[in-house]
Amino acid sequence: MEANTRSTGRLPAAFLTPGSSSFMDFLGEHQPEMLPGNRQLPPVQGVIEAPHGTTIVAVTFPGGVVLAGDRRATMGNMIAQRDIEKVFPADEYSAVGIAGTAGLAVEMVKLFQLELEHFEKVEGAQLSLEGKANRLSTMIRSNLGMAMQGLAVVPLFAGYDVDRGRGRIFSYDVTGGRSEERHFATTGSGSVFARGAMKKLFRDDLTEEQATTLVVQALYDAADDDSATGGPDVARRIYPIITVITEDGFRRLGEDEAAELAGSVLQARLEQPDGPRAALL
């Protein structure tokens, strides 16, 4: 049958048989060995050294949500990559920022993108934002075996909810547990420092421009205290990846926009190295 379909150019029957709208279910039925959760690693001694993505931040504003990430990947105490991309569109109205084991995280994002695309093609409509968040939770849970060996993936998921007319943020733990964050969220090695900055600077009435400035300030503070987080690198023209999701869909700021935004933050830091100060009362 396989040889016949190859010679005729026809798709195998499995591709033409009605079934689940989940691409993961399809793989699980026909090619289960391709699912990340079905891989078995040999027993290892100690920690597996692999590049890790670090800090991701997200913040809502009245018109949508901003998701951003630094560009550094580390392997132990070494900088493995200076310009890694950690923020990806999931579909037209959502995005994923990755922290944890970089290779597995990027693979999970690609599978997630396929999952959403497959559902839309089969059902003729997009999943709700909550449904997308639940699908990602299932994928993270399937990686638990890898996480137990030190290869964890802990992303942030953000998107514009077209039904509710606002931006939403979902955070996860290593077991796939999902929580919706009210205003802002962080993940990765510099998350505690970034969260502290966002907690002091967040306001309910942020404009889109202020929200993008806030995430750069938060990433700068994270890089200031966490060696695994990379700040803006003017010499190499490496700047944070900043994405905005509104009712118009997903948009990534261009390099010139990111450079201008990072430049304004760096210029202000010459006067106030510790960043903007929040009012005491």
Swiss-Prot record:
<dbReference type="GO" id="GO:0004298">
    <property type="term" value="F:threonine-type endopeptidase activity"/>
</dbReference>
<dbReference type="InterPro" id="IPR029055">
    <property type="entry name" value="Ntn_hydrolases_N"/>
</dbReference>
<keyword id="KW-0963">Cytoplasm</keyword>
<dbReference type="GO" id="GO:0019774">
    <property type="term" value="C:proteasome core complex, beta-subunit complex"/>
</dbReference>
<dbReference type="GO" id="GO:0051603">
    <property type="term" value="P:proteolysis involved in protein catabolic process"/>
</dbReference>
<dbReference type="InterPro" id="IPR022483">
    <property type="entry name" value="PSB_actinobac"/>
</dbReference>
<dbReference type="GO" id="GO:0005737">
    <property type="term" value="C:cytoplasm"/>
</dbReference>
<keyword id="KW-0888">Threonine protease</keyword>
<keyword id="KW-0865">Zymogen</keyword>
<feature type="propeptide" description="Removed in mature form; by autocatalysis">
    <location>
        <begin position="1"/>
        <end position="53"/>
    </location>
</feature>
<keyword id="KW-0068">Autocatalytic cleavage</keyword>
<dbReference type="Pfam" id="PF00227">
    <property type="entry name" value="Proteasome"/>
</dbReference>
<comment type="similarity">
    <text>Belongs to the peptidase T1B family.</text>
</comment>
<keyword id="KW-0647">Proteasome</keyword>
<keyword id="KW-0378">Hydrolase</keyword>
<feature type="active site" description="Nucleophile">
    <location>
        <position position="54"/>
    </location>
</feature>
<dbReference type="InterPro" id="IPR001353">
    <property type="entry name" value="Proteasome_sua/b"/>
</dbReference>
<dbReference type="GO" id="GO:0010498">
    <property type="term" value="P:proteasomal protein catabolic process"/>
</dbReference>
<comment type="function">
    <text>Component of the proteasome core, a large protease complex with broad specificity involved in protein degradation. The S.coelicolor proteasome is able to cleave oligopeptides after hydrophobic residues, but not after basic or acidic residues, thus displaying chymotrypsin-like activity but not trypsin-like activity.</text>
</comment>
<dbReference type="GO" id="GO:0019941">
    <property type="term" value="P:modification-dependent protein catabolic process"/>
</dbReference>
<comment type="subunit">
    <text>The 20S proteasome core is composed of 14 alpha and 14 beta subunits that assemble into four stacked heptameric rings, resulting in a barrel-shaped structure. The two inner rings, each composed of seven catalytic beta subunits, are sandwiched by two outer rings, each composed of seven alpha subunits. The catalytic chamber with the active sites is on the inside of the barrel. Has probably a gated structure, the ends of the cylinder being occluded by the N-termini of the alpha-subunits. Is likely capped by the proteasome-associated ATPase, ARC.</text>
</comment>
<comment type="pathway">
    <text>Protein degradation; proteasomal Pup-dependent pathway.</text>
</comment>
<dbReference type="InterPro" id="IPR023333">
    <property type="entry name" value="Proteasome_suB-type"/>
</dbReference>
<protein>
    <recommendedName>
        <fullName>Proteasome subunit beta</fullName>
        <ecNumber>3.4.25.1</ecNumber>
    </recommendedName>
</protein>
<dbReference type="InterPro" id="IPR000243">
    <property type="entry name" value="Pept_T1A_subB"/>
</dbReference>
<keyword id="KW-0645">Protease</keyword>
